[in-house]
Design a protein with these regions (language model features):
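A Lys-centered signature of the CheY-like receiver
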Residues: 133
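Helix N-cap/capping motif at the beta->alpha junctions
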Residues: 55-68, 88-91
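Alpha4 helix (beta4-alpha4-beta5 surface) of REC/receiver domains from two-component response regulators
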Residues: 90, 103, 114-129, 142
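C-terminal catalytic ATP-binding subdomain
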Residues: 1-18, 49, 141-148
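Active-site residues of response regulator receiver
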Residues: 80, 111
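Charged docking surfaces used in two-component/phosphorelay signaling
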Residues: 40-48
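Receiver (REC) domain active-site loop signature in two-component systems and cognate sites
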Residues: 83-86, 95, 127
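Active-site beta3 strand of CheY-like receiver
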Residues: 71-78
Length: 148
């Protein structure tokens, strides 16, 4: 059993190595998800890159954070889609309606909705990209490289 555990740990380390070698120190990411565990996991993974990570529990809270933030505070938003109070599509539309740079903030859907039509809907509603949950570390790294 120990051998299997060691092998799994080594595989996990190799899987995360590329992501952990990335350096996004000084970058700030907002993670929006109504599930606390999902937020915690995303924060842990993203902090491995040196990025500062903030969270919001729904779309309305995310819009409020972006709205009152100093210009350029956030570099990227990862947005869940299905949330109470305000869903990810509504939150994206609200952020897109903000003046200046805030309205152009990169927003990437981070959702279990992973069919081709979900990806297209995210783009049609103003999101810049899409990544499916559970997170694929290589795809996450590609998204970070694209937007940070």
């Amino acid at each position: 059993r120990q051998f299997t555990s060691d092998r799994k740990e080594k595989a996990a380390r190799n899987y995360l190595q590329k992501l952990s070698e990335a350096d996004y120190t000084g970058k700030r990411i907002l993670v929006v998800d109504d599930n606390e565990l999902n937020r915690e996991i995303a924060v842990e993974i993203l902090q491995m890159t040196g990025a500062e990570v903030e969270t919001a529990e729904n779309g309305k809270a995310a819009v409020e954070k972006v709205e009152v933030s100093p210009k350029g505070l956030y570099d990227l938003v990862f947005m869940d889609i299905q949330m109470p109070v305000m869903n990810g599509y509504e939150a994206t539309a609200a952020i897109r309606s903000l003046p200046g740079e805030k309205g152009k903030l990169p927003i990437v859907a981070m959702t279990a909705n992973a069919f081709a039509e979900d990806v297209q809907l995210a783009k049609n509603t103003g999101m810049n990209g899409h990544i499916a949950k559970p997170l694929d570390m290589n795809k996450l790294n590609d998204v970070l490289e694209s937007w940070l």
